[in-house]
Amino acid sequence: MSRQFPHSSAPLRSVKEVQFGLLSPEEVRAISVAKIEYPETMDQATKRPREGGLNDPRLGSIDRNFKCQTCGEDMAECPGHFGHIELAKPVFHIGFIAKIKKVCECVCMHCGKLLLDESNPAMAQAIRIRDPKKRFNAVWNLCKGKMICEADVLQDDGEGNEPKRTSRGGCGHTQPVVRKDGLKLWGTWKQNKNYDETEQPERRLLTPSEILNVFKHINSEDCVRLGFNEDYARPEWMLITVLPVPPPPVRPSIAFNDTARGEDDLTFKLADVIKANINVQRLELDGSPQHVISEFEALLQFHVATYMDNDIAGQPQALQKTGRPIKSIRARLKGKEGRLRGNLMGKRVDFSARTVISGDPNLDLDQVGVPISIARTLTYPEIVTPYNIHRLTEYVRNGPNEHPGAKYVIRDTGDRIDLRYNKRAGDIALQYGWKVERHLMDDDPVLFNRQPSLHKMSMMCHRVKVMPYSTFRLNLSVTSPYNADFDGDEMNLHVPQSPETRAELSEICAVPLQIVSPQSNKPVMGIVQDTLCGVRKMTLRDIFIEYDQVMNMLYWIPDWDGVIPPMNLKDLNNVKQMVVSGSKGSFINISQMSACVGQQIVEGKRIPFGFADRSLPHFTKDDYSPESKGFVENSYLRGLTPQEFFFHAMAGREGLIDTAVKTAETGYIQRRLVKALEDIMVHYDGTTRNSLGDIIQFVYGEDGVDGTQVESQSVDVIPGTDESFERRYRVDLLDPEKCIRDSLLESGKEVRGDVNLQRVLDEEYEQLCNDRRYLREVCFTNGDYTWPLPVNLRRIIQNAQQLFHGGRHKASDLRLEEIVEGVKELCKKLLVLRGDSPLVKESQENATLLFQCLVRSRLATRRVIEEFRLNRMSFEWAMGEIETQFQKSLVHPGEMVGVIAAQSIGEPATQMTLNTFHYAGVSSKNVTLGVPRLKEILNVAKNIKTPALTVYLEKDIAADIEKAKVVQSAIEHTTLKNVTASTEIFYDPDPRSTVLEEDYDTVEAYFAIPDEKVEESIEKQSPWLLRLELDRAKMLDKQLTMAQVAEKISQNFGEDLFVIWSDDTADKLIIRCRVVRDPKSLDEDVDAEEDQILKRIEAHMLESISLRGIQGITRVFMMQHKLSLPDETGEFKQGQEWVLETDGVNLADVMAVPGVDAKRTYSNNFIEILSVLGIEATRSALFKEILNVIAFDGSYVNYRHMALLVDVMTARGHLMAITRHGINRADTGALMRCSFEETVEILLEAGAAAELDDCHGISENVVLGQLAPLGTGAFDVMVDDKILQSSPSNMSVPVGAAEGAGAYADDGGATPYREYDMEDDKIQFEEGAGFSPIHTAPVSDGAGALTAYGGQPGSPSPTSPFAYGATSPAYGGASPGYGVTSPTYSPTSPSYSPTSPSYSPTSPSYSPTSPSYSPTSPSYSPTSPSYSPTSPSYSPTSPSYSPTSPSYSPTSPSYSPTSPSYSPTSPSYSPTSPSYSPTSPSYSPTSPSYSPTSPSYSPTSPLYSPTSPSYSPTSPSYSPTSPSYSPTSPSYSPTSPQYSPTSPAYSPTSPQYSPNSPQYSPRSPLYSPDQNDDKDKKQ
């Protein structure tokens, strides 16, 4: 902090936990410094704040001329002090009024005792609940029905004796029913049961004073049972007796002139409270009648309530004089602009800039062009050290207006010198330890951002490049992650203000490190637009370019071609070129421009008829012709007619509206996702947990791998026939046909017939068969065999073949059992979780299972020898490489995977169209998709728009459409209404005959055969007839017969209805029903009502008679689904099966239908799945649904993100919606919940329940402004005091010597890319070898000048084998790369000024010919000596460079480029020193005496000279993990003779020296010395 605060005796600590509670009246009085009694703020006589008024001077100063009377500080420093108002009568706190009512229902309103106690078993259960809020609700639910406070209870002793009476100390009074009305509570006392019902119950007001009195009597035990807290939140504190008055800084007033002040809303409101309070006091003293007093009490209650909350339902809002509602305290806190979300969770910050962006193809991917005006405004505080004092002095001299300058100097006392007003700025002598706020310079890391920030690639770290003019410039390829274009977009830039932040930005957030996105494990940046189009043109098969033309490509472009154009668009057509190369546009754009715009669609249909059956007035009625319904036949080129234009505008308008609505919807979805998952992090034990420590996943993503490190790979054991599988993997040494060819193996002859070896190979083959079976039956049942897995095996094998290509044509020296053993060992080494407990072992096995199958299938014995032809060296190298890469691809502890998952799901949602119109499928079966469906899933909606089942059938039925139809009709729910065409009621008095001609035959036929029962009932039959006519088509469709329908009707009504039905073959399908009357009630007047009865029967019949099928299934469609199953040869074949899809769901009943495959049947309503199949099935269903939504429009999101989301939603055993009803019902801290929604309610609830927030979450720490425990803050750093004491102090170096090093030493660059000054033309590259971006050789330095990360051992560094003299052509002063005009050696750079005293060209240590200081030396990166981008050991993916590795912490003393012992120019480090001659005897690499802990190694010790014989870089103990390892040490420099890549000692073919050989595992405990001996012997 640069500002100095006045001295305070309070110790400074970070907040560890927050205790919520209610203030008791005693506390309020104790906190208060003034009792406020007057509503005025100013004393009119003295024109000063009035004592005892609302702006009492003791509360804090409001005027910069006066000091605060309490603390004596001025306006800027005084934090303000609380006052208090003594209320004449207690009032309810508006936030707690509902809680007060509930407590009234729990305790006796007479004696304050809880109405139930442990003697009630349900109550005993409720009291045991630990969470106070839940406990209170449980107790309230039991007590609210209890209407009497019992004096003694009957207790049953359980042995059948008389129940005993035990006293519980109640008072025996009846309890009132409490009702809330506005701001009042009313109690209604019901009289005892034995009184008359007519008697009016007593109803009266429960005054706050009365309730306060009752609450004071609640004893501490009951207090805890009710979920309160004796110390922090007693129930009576929910009523306000003393109102705290916030200090003026909370409610500042504006001075218009000396007299008038504009007061804040809260001040107005407090004045109203005081006025009302004075009125009540006055009336009390005057002894006014009660009804008058209660009027004024209600007014006081109203003012206190609206002061806190002015949006009370059913209450008039308190208004200001202008008629604007007053802004209450609650309104200040809640909502997006409120205190929490607006000022605590997110604030406006300093050191930021915003301007328009434009593109610049000449910038690096990770650079950003910053206007000079911004660079002069933004600063970075740099601490003065011996290494930068010259440079900083130069900046201070330049002052604030000249670009490489400075704005402020801050002394160690904290005083700030403003250089704008300091006339003698040039004379300020900087001291070590001061700070200089210097301008933004080239290569400073900055955070660059474009809103909306939908994923983490919307904020990335760029390197500054200061440029003229006023816009930010950025490389074209970086626009896609920002979703930016140059049509006027603006972007924000933030400057980090501490070395830690800079380090974190440049090592974690740098653009090159974000190229591969974890969202869908693919690059998010690529070549776009012009570049893409140009690249395609240059690389067409028929375009040939001369070498010199390529060299000068920037100056002219070849126009050679010799191709006859085809009939379609010429390849030279500019539009077509853009489409084909993919830089802009699509096929449809071309068609619409040149051929025809096509049909316009609104809401998924053609243009609708707007009025009077036409779409526009000049069409005729019912015109369905194309032009009337919106078909545009013209192209944009020909132009649209007016009506076409109008229809086109309609469709376009819909798109715009859709986009606007969608943006708001998806923005809210994204916010909810982030809030639900924000605290989920990978911990150091490999588990994924939230801030409470609940385990969400045992292993992140179920495999523990980082989403950016996986690639789609095919597991080769899954596809293919059994025969081809055997051919590919089985080795039979006893059968010459199936044995490996002799010519491929050195031991080819010996292995023939080796039974023991055959046993090993059989075991391997058996394992492969098991893999194949398991993967086919469990994992990939549909025969799909690609899956995102870590470590690209194909690439590793290819690199192995190329690096060790000598062995490709010779027989391999591998032994077969070595391969099997090697693969087994490798599988054991793939550790995701470490530990021995059974649980850990199981998780470990599950996590690596798929990858093990992949490794076993790729590195099977037969394939290694026959297909890949690896020899021992290349095989061992590959094994080591796989292990290293696998360890590298594991997820880092501290990674905030929750937020990544939320962004990965929210971002595609933004791209989704809102209403995805129903896809044209079978008879309009529609499914909700897109954003509306995503909303349903995340809200866990009870009633979804389109519930549907997918009913799979048993094998034999699924193949046969006829059998499937039987099941279909059995499932589809059919009511009588579905098949009825019409119903009629007739008066047809004779039951044996009929007045209807067409029914005559039916009736005759029925009565032709006499039946006793029928004869009996004829007498009782009603003359009214209900006649149903059924629809024959529907009956046939549903396969129903008349008899079945009639039987269902009879079943329903039994003997009371007489039913006659026509034959199935009759002309019309008729059912005749008559009511059978009870002979007892054969009165005449019944006849009159009978037709009414019949009408009711008719309605009931149609609605409720279910003919067949399952309730809830309205329709069933038959669909053919593709199915791939292995046939008898073992190959997956595509087949078809019939599947039923339904509208409506009823999973439990459908599963029970015979013929349905219950195992596969699926419902898209996962709430139903939860009730039928349980939570684990729900998790899969939920995953499937989210996947469907995302995959529908062709997006792909990696499995792990969706898995994490569904795991969070189901982790507690019930479905947690991603809404306030789900997220905010979790037991996370109150601060975290209130930062989402319902801010004030949650804080009030937290106060009443006296919650404790332990600040483990993200939001809590953001609110408190602390470092949250995530990412680099997830661990603590242990400081080694011993090393600290022995470390060199900054001041111990002569300034001159240090200055050379300090040239640019203070800060590393941000990215591993850079331009190279020189290249050796003698280098030959093999095709493709080692140029993969991930391939590393950790020791060879300077390798791979053409790739980002490192290359192969045949290192193209500009070196010659032994000649290291100063005359070496690569370093001579005459070397073209080293002119004084060379750009890296700019004479204007301040520290290079030839007049600088430390730069004596004659100084032996600073000879420009010193090889280590040539600007072309890879270790001399212009930004810092320690930052050689070409060094593979600096590769961001290099194992030894793990940002978590303690020895490589950029702040560790041994790494600090500012540490004196690392200055490459320090005299003792001169590589030209004679003892560095490689032939010098003292330079023995095997010298045993070199131990980094030996006293002679203390960097400050006088004995420590690199010339000391014991200092050998190749000495075994000089391991890269040793604390002394620094890439800048000259012994690691590519110019060191020991590292000459061409030196025979560095033979890439020497197996022991392979940098990635298994012995060189970066985690291997020692870099074993005997390797070096072997090497010497070999030479």
Swiss-Prot record:
Stretches for region C-terminal domain (CTD): 1385-1566
Residue numbers spanned by region Bridging helix: 642-654
Ranges of the Sequence repeats in the UniProt entry: 1385-1391, 1392-1398, 1399-1405, 1406-1412, 1413-1419, 1420-1426, 1427-1433, 1434-1440, 1441-1447, 1448-1454, 1455-1461, 1462-1468, 1469-1475, 1476-1482, 1483-1489, 1490-1496, 1497-1503, 1504-1510, 1511-1517, 1518-1524, 1525-1531, 1532-1538, 1539-1545, 1546-1552, 1553-1559, 1560-1566
GO biological process, one term: transcription by RNA polymerase II
Ranges annotated as biased composition (Low complexity): 1382-1565
Single GO MF annotation: DNA binding
Subcellular location: Nucleus
Covalent cross-link (Glycyl lysine isopeptide (Lys-Gly) (interchain with G-Cter in ubiquitin)), residues: 1080
Disulfide bonds: none
GO terms for cellular component: mitochondrion; RNA polymerase II, core complex
EC category: transferase
Keyword Iron: no
Pfam families for the chain: RNA_pol_Rpb1_1, RNA_pol_Rpb1_2, RNA_pol_Rpb1_3, RNA_pol_Rpb1_4, RNA_pol_Rpb1_5, RNA_pol_Rpb1_6, RNA_pol_Rpb1_7, RNA_pol_Rpb1_R
Subunit details: Component of the RNA polymerase II (Pol II) complex consisting of 12 subunits.
Family the UniProt entry places it in: Belongs to the RNA polymerase beta' chain family.
Protein purpose: DNA-dependent RNA polymerase catalyzes the transcription of DNA into RNA using the four ribonucleoside triphosphates as substrates. Largest and catalytic component of RNA polymerase II which synthesizes mRNA precursors and many functional non-coding RNAs. Forms the polymerase active center together with the second largest subunit. Pol II is the central component of the basal RNA polymerase II transcription machinery. It is composed of mobile elements that move relative to each other.
Domain notes: The C-terminal domain (CTD) serves as a platform for assembly of factors that regulate transcription initiation, elongation, termination and mRNA processing.
Protein name in UniProt: DNA-directed RNA polymerase II subunit RPB1
Organism: Meyerozyma guilliermondii (strain ATCC 6260 / CBS 566 / DSM 6381 / JCM 1539 / NBRC 10279 / NRRL Y-324) (Yeast)
